Amino acid sequence: YNQFEYTYLCIKSILENSGDVAYEIIIADDCSTDLTTKIDEIIHGVHTIHNESNLRFLRNCNNAAKQARGQYILFLNNDTQVQADWLAPLIELIERDDSIGMVGSKLVYPDGRLQEAGGILWQDGSAWNYGNRANPDEPEFNYVKEADYISGAAIMIRKSLWEEIGGFDERFVPAYCEDSDLAFEVRKHGCKVMYQPKSVVVHFEGISNGTDTTSGQKAYQVTNQKKFLEKWQQELQENHLPNAVDPFRARERSVHKKILLMVDHYVPHYDKDAGSRTVYQYLQLFVNQGFSVKFIGDNFFAHQPYTDTLQQMGVEVLYGPYYAKHWKDWQKENGKDIGYVFLNRPHISVKYIDAVREFTNARVIYYGHDLHFLREKREYELTGDAALLQSSADWEKKELDLILAADMAYYPSYVEEQAIHEIAPQAKVKAIPAYLFSDVEECEYHFDKRKDLMFIGGFGHRPNVDAVKWLANEIMPALVKKLPDIRVYILGSNPPEEVKQLATENLLIKGFVTDEELQEYYQNCRISIVPLRYGAGIKGKVI
């Protein structure tokens, strides 16, 4: 209503920042008296509805939505300015899962402070704009999550669901609480309401109706809150918390969810090493099983694109200087809510297990990836280096202490399970799969059409460096003598200079390859070789 300048700038921001998404713009003009009456003459390519009388906010929205032709309806206040690439993330999220009925944006004030990262509704019907006036870049505001509601300044709903619900409930005429009510209706109809932090919208707030709740249209905010409480009192009592109690759970609707904390050396670089791929796939599993998942990388660095991938998956990743310094405070504050802690690797787990035991009542799972003491013992047997034997003994004590301190220890190989039981029969240890496969595409092998050999391994792992050096110096000369045209491709992230220098016309050091490129190598090479002289655990390159 009126405020032409805001409406014009809002539409300008849509046109500039929406990418190649197909959309229509419907301007719902609620009987304005300013230049808005001529907006369709000023801005072309929009569909403008000029109400003959003032319908007020709620009925204006319901009336305009009848004209929408798209698969989704996005309600956007005229006192907003959308930011770069705001629209595609909303669509990508709602299309990810048929059970998602409505999605909403991260709202920020014009001065850059956060206005809302999803809303919280308490048992008494009162509401919080979660994160209000905080830094919008903090980790806790930047992962996909369920929300009690998203403020109606920027929400998108499936059109079919909107029509099934019947639009905004007119008991909340003229405005206020209709967005919260819509979110509850979405859940009543079996769907979820989700917050998408990658969609950022600046909201000026209060431009049309002001901010004084004692007079004017804004006064309906208080009246409608009472109506909202009356309508949803049973739902609020059963599935929401008392006012200001445990916002850690309330902010993401995890009142009835199990919360799991995963700890590893850094955010999993799932396309660069086997251990990271394992961690990533188990994170996916826990999210898909309905856990609320938190992740700490011991370096507290937001490696990209990996951190963004986890956040879009629904994992809250703790990173940055604050958490690097205060992770124990975070555990102390929220430990009562954490039901499970999944610790990875001995050199990382030893730093965290005492704090986990002190500040939480969580069941502790330790995943060793491999037995370090067994790997170093095997390297000693190969090289005769006495320092490795001492190191193996040191690792054995550390690893055994962790295994016995955990509620359950897992390894990817029955060999590790057996080795532990030989020295500690009382240990609770089991073998579990290193990788989780689903929807595996069938491949026509045609070995007669294939040629060449390949080796894949991340070179941050010492046995892989040794393997390639041994291959180059001991095996390749005999292989080339027998097959002069043979090609052996060495694949894997971060090959050191000592590996790069081994390259010949027969031994090709390719370094990092994408998953798609790796698939091509697997389909075109005749044999995948594993010239490891020592190691432990399951070799991802074999699986």
Regions found by a protein language model. Give the residues of each.
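Acidic donor-binding loop of glycosyltransferase active sites
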Residues: 338-339, 407, 523-538
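A short, conserved alpha-helix in the catalytic core of glycosyltransferases
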Residues: 85-91, 142, 146-166, 171-202
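Short, flexible, basic/aromatic active-site loop/helix in glycosyltransferases
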Residues: 105, 110, 122-148, 163
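Conserved catalytic-core segment of nucleotide-activated headgroup transferases in glycan assembly
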Residues: 271, 275-280, 284, 295, ...
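Short aromatic/hydrophobic "clamp" motif used to bind/position activated sugar donors
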Residues: 73
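Glycine-rich, basic loop-to-helix element that forms the pyrophosphate-binding segment
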Residues: 51-68
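Acidic donor-binding segment of Leloir-type glycosyltransferases
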Residues: 15-53
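Conserved donor NDP-sugar-binding/catalytic core segment of glycosyltransferases
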Residues: 80-122
